[in-house]
Amino acid sequence: MTNYFDKIEKVNYEGADSINPFAYKYYNANEVILGKTMADHLRLAVCYWHTFCWNGNDMFGVGSLDRSWQKQTDPLAGAKQKADIAFEFLTKLGVPYYCFHDVDIAPEGNSYQEYVNNFNTIVDVLEQKQAETGIKLLWGTANCFTNPRYMSGAATNPNPEIFARAGAQVFNAMNATKRLGGENYVLWGGREGYETLLNTDLRREREQIGRFMQMVVEHKHKIGFKGTLLIEPKPQEPTKHQYDYDVATVYGFLKQFGLEKEIKVNIEANHATLAGHTFQHEIATAAALDILGSIDANRGDPQLGWDTDQFPNSVEENTLAIYEILKAGGLTTGGLNFDAKIRRQSIDPYDLFHAHIGAIDVLALSLRRAAKMLEDQTLQHIVEQRYAGWNGELGQQILNGKSSLEALAQAAQHLEPQPVSGQQEYLENLVNSYIYR
């Protein structure tokens, strides 16, 4: 293993009183909460793209980060060095999973065959790294949005040859994900949307991407991939309007093409912000629709209208999010992946550790608070009491199809229903009593 981060041997749990910046204050992987270890609840993952591929560039400036593996004259040698350093980081951080896009791990090359050869070479490397370290792949995916060929979309492209090239990438990425023991496969429609309706056939593009997803499901079953397929909702950016706008929109799409039993969602906090929702809302919606799959843990900036991909730092926000996950029975094949990047001015390599350690502690403390809320059942009891009338005779007749508008009109003659307080202020105080205890 490399020793790029030679100042750190291993990040360990030292407790809330520790002043060691390279120690966990709240994340104790083996601590049992609600019958599961903290590690099993959170299933933490580090993303390859922001952590090891981004060079610090933005729309107004070139890269600011000094990454030795990005300076290699041989791109494939650079990819191998990147894998060495990535697994050093993962091992020292002590997280069980990682995630990647195909072109994160291997250079795309100048032809399809070169792409395949490079990709397979690095998949061999990752397979060996996983065997050596015990680190696993949470999910893989294909980047069908960066290359200029995808400027008008991949599955929604007006050119079927580009559709085919995207299909080939997904074919290779799915096969690699299965080979590496990946527990999920993610599809994010980065450019599956439009800039203007003046040159867009909405019905056709919707049918194209519907067929693409059906082909993905068909291939999953053909190769015997046992993981979960996930769509990641996002309302806009890079396109003006994306077809996977939010969780509810994705569910409608899945229903239209008969895929609601085959595909779930990977929810990103920052994407919820862009869609005008809370993180909690998107998770609760997915759970209610039985399509909650996995989480991209990050945060956005409410004052900015773009995907800032900052590390999560709010125990208040994440306690409510994890509470919804726990209510839904927890994550199965999914996990909490840090789809987040350090800031452009954070040029010290060890800033990567500070960012992840802080975020992991935020999620760990949020898990503790959410678990206590669920265990006490105080909040849930109030909600159940609020809807208790639906368990009575009238409520059951309505829900079971044994009533009609005419029957309701007759029943209403003998009813004088009175409003009951929603107790929002009390409930907010109750939640704060758990968070800040």
UniProtKB/Swiss-Prot annotation:
Homotetramer. Its main location: cytoplasm. This is Xylose isomerase. Transmembrane segments: none annotated. InterPro entries: Xyl_isomerase-like_sf, Xylose_isom_bac, Xylose_isomerase. Keywords: Carbohydrate metabolism, Cytoplasm, Isomerase, Magnesium, Metal-binding, Xylose metabolism. It comes from Actinobacillus succinogenes (strain ATCC 55618 / DSM 22257 / CCUG 43843 / 130Z). The keyword Transit peptide does not apply. Its cofactor is Mg(2+). GO terms for biological process: D-xylose metabolic process. Its EC number is 5.3.1.5. Coiled coil: none annotated. GO terms for molecular function: magnesium ion binding; xylose isomerase activity. One of its GO terms (cellular component) is cytoplasm. Mg(2+) 2 binds at E268, H271, D307, D309. The active site is at H101, D104. Belongs to the xylose isomerase family. Binds 2 magnesium ions per subunit. It is found in: Cytoplasm.
